């Protein structure tokens, strides 16, 4: 990863990534930061970024033991905190179907991003119950038609989740 790619990460994530680059044993079992493991179409970047929030900085590891090793390293070196997504333990579920009028629905977020197949359960966990729509009117309609059983995000990044509406800046 270049320094430019690390912009916006918390200090502890930046430090951990840098240390992994210089220490092969530490790096073993580390897939990378979630933001670098998904490919998002340009027109959906705001919606996906809002959907994922801070999870974009989560570090994907092969196993729980790999995550544990990194947690111990963070503590031992007083680096700070980071969140981890072990491939072997994360399970996700994707929405089966969206009821009602499909007009304005762009799709299920997990289907709209590209990723390595081995990260599929992580993507389903984080984006499998999120629907991306074109605008707020569609979001409100879809929420009513589906009983708000999932998160709805507009292309502009506004979020409707259960009875909460979050407007992005």
Question: Can you say where each PLM-predicted feature lies in the sequence?
Answer:
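Hinge-like oligomerization/junction regions that interrupt long coiled-coil arms in large cytoskeletal
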Residues: 2-169
């Amino acid at each position: 990863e270049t320094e430019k790619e690390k912009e916006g990460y918390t200090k502890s994530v930046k430090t951990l990534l840098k240390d992994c680059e210089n220490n092969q044993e530490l790096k073993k079992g580390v897939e990378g930061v979630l933001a670098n493991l998904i490919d998002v179409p340009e027109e959906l970047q705001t919606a996906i970024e809002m959907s994922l929030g801070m999870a974009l900085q989560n570090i994907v590891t092969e196993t729980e033991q790999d995550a544990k090793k990194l947690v111990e390293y963070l503590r031992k070196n007083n680096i700070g905190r980071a969140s981890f997504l072990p491939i072997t333990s994360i399970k996700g579920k994707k929405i089966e179907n969206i009821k009602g009028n499909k007009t304005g629905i762009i799709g299920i977020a997990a289907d709209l991003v590209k990723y390595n197949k081995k990260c599929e359960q992580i993507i389903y966990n984080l984006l499998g119950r999120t629907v991306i729509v074109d605008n707020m009117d569609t979001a409100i309609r879809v929420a009513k038609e589906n009983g708000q059983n999932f998160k709805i995000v507009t292309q502009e990044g506004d979020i409707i989740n259960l009875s909460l509406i979050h407007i992005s800046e």
